């Protein structure tokens, strides 16, 4: 379709821990990197998650799950309705990897999506963690690759969990 939102996303996992991450946006020529314990960078400059204190003033990224079970669509739309009614704005650019990099860089205050694959999230998870953010599941459990994801700066992350958790059906709780 020629829609220019895509990225190269690479992560190195060693003994079950994400150690290094790279997300490259060839359209904007931006290079995001992180190494465990060394922080996150954009073009070699340290980045941090936003300092936004509430969901009400935040910009949230999401995606529309790929081939979602039709029985779960209403649940997802209910979540979208709550976030759209609370946040300053919701964006759906199309690349989960870039959305997560944008959370790490403070361009987005939070993110959630269901049905992503490990290659969609691995690099972004480490970027956010190294930039001072939080990543988990919709129920607040620790995130493991391949699970449904909620991420953000620490304050917005907690508010996203409070908003999304009660609306998350059992089939999407992993």
Model features per residue range: what roles?
Residues 119:
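Acidic donor-binding loop at a coil-to-helix junction in glycosyltransferase catalytic cores
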């Amino acid at each position: 379709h020629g829609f220019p939102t895509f990225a190269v996303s690479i992560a190195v996992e060693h003994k079950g821990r994400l150690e290094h991450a790279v997300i490259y946006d060839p359209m904007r020529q931006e290079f995001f990197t992180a190494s465990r314990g060394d922080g996150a960078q954009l073009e070699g400059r340290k980045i941090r998650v936003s300092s936004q204190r509430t969901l009400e003033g935040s910009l949230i990224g999401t995606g529309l799950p790929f081939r979602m079970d039709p029985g779960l669509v209403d649940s997802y739309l209910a979540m979208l309705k709550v976030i759209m009614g609370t946040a300053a704005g919701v964006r759906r650019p199309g690349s989960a990897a870039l959305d997560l990099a944008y959370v790490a860089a403070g361009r987005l205050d939070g993110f959630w999506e269901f049905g992503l694959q490990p290659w969609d999230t691995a690099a972004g998870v480490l970027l956010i963690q190294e930039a001072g953010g939080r990543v988990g599941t919709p129920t607040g459990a620790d995130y493991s690759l391949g699970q449904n994801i909620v991420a953000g700066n620490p304050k917005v992350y907690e508010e996203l969990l409070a908003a999304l958790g009660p609306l998350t059906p059992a089939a999407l709780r992993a």
